[in-house]
Amino acid sequence: MSHDQRSPSEEVSRTALSKPASESTIVGDGHHPLPAKDTSTRAWLVVVGGLLIYFPTFGFLNAFGTFQTFYVQDLLAGTSSSKIAWIGSLQIFLLFIGGLVVGPLYDKVGATKLLVPGSVVYVVALMLTSVCKKYYQLILAQGILFGCANALLFYPTIAAINQWFDRRRGIALGLAVSGSSLGGIFWTEIIQLMLDHIGFGWTVRACGFISLAFLVPSCVLIITRPPEPGESKDMQLDFKAIFTDTKYLLFSVGMLLVLWGMFIPFFYLPSYGETYGMSVTGANNLLAYMNAGSFVGRVLTGLMADRLGRFNVISLAALSCGILLFCLHKITTSGAIIAFSTLYGICSGGLISLQSACIGQITPDHSIIGVKIGLMMGFCSVGGLTGSPIAGALLSADHQKWYGFIDFCGSILMGGAVVTILSRYVAAPREWKF
């Protein structure tokens, strides 16, 4: 079937996010043909840049459990784990809600003008974090400023990859976002090692210097793709149409529930391991196992999504995460906890990378994909902000017994899976591959 003969539900989105004239690295004017989507070297260089971005940004966030344990036991000893979890939750909240601003900004100014200041703010946030001694200081530096920096880096990257890929969008996004899993493995190990040998301040400063080595080349590799001939250069926003699109609203609610619970194990699994007799080092390594599984999951779900349907795969991933979390009631030995962390990483791997691909698939007007991704992530920010503190409060209320914690996490992920499946049915009730 030719490209022009595809049905709307089969048509993989071609985004028309505009590129300003001032950012004309590549010109699509008829005299300088645009590099091909999916296959050109230029397109895959954007993916490489995305991997380099997500290694220090999302990867560092995936290692927050190491900081959580250190703050509870050392720097902020005496402060409840629920209160400390707000630091990591603020990062997620600002990363998500930042899409309301950064998404439309990307449509107007392109990638470079967001990635460069985002990189500067990222490094400054870590340098300020390195001198923090009190809780409120960490909230401001590691929570708020670092979260804003992540938003400036996350959305231009994921929007640019959506522009450069069509048929292979799933695997392209999976490969790029797998950088966060590789980063999670690296940061989990190196942070704990440095904390043991050089202390908190120089550990965080060293993280800033290492991150800079990844951020600089990514700012060069990631560029906005100009619109193709015939594509709209201006956003045609109709908020009434967006907010009355049933399949989009259902998918957004599903992702809110999924992201409400998905990040909680990344914050608390080391503490869970210590509860059941694992050493501090062994418990911290659970994050490395989880991120290793996440790397496999992101690549695997990207490949599966392009072949079996993106909504099908993301729904299956969310359902699997919920089932695994309920299994924690019976998982109390070191070997079983390690197996859980790896499997959870695999199943949760595609939940971030496939979101934008799903939005693109149900967006007929490709000039507003960036806005719709930003609106959805802004909506999901509520879950990112409150999920871990609520789970921590349940843990404290149960006197460090994990029953309520597990039931909360598992229930909201299962609920998110059900709503996501419903959105898939509304979007394409008669097609198996969607």
UniProtKB/Swiss-Prot annotation:
CDD domains: MFS_MCT_SLC16. MFS-type transporter; part of the gene cluster that mediates the biosynthesis of pyranonigrins, a family of antioxidative compounds. May be involved in the secretion of pyranonigrins. Pfam families: MFS_1. Residues 1-34 are annotated as: Disordered. One of its GO terms (molecular function) is transmembrane transporter activity. The gene is pynF. Its main location: membrane. It is found in: Cell membrane. It is a multi-pass membrane protein. This is MFS-type transporter pynF. The chain crosses the membrane at residues 44-64, 84-104, 109-129, 138-158, 171-191, 203-223, 249-269, 280-302, 311-331, 334-354, 375-395, 402-422.
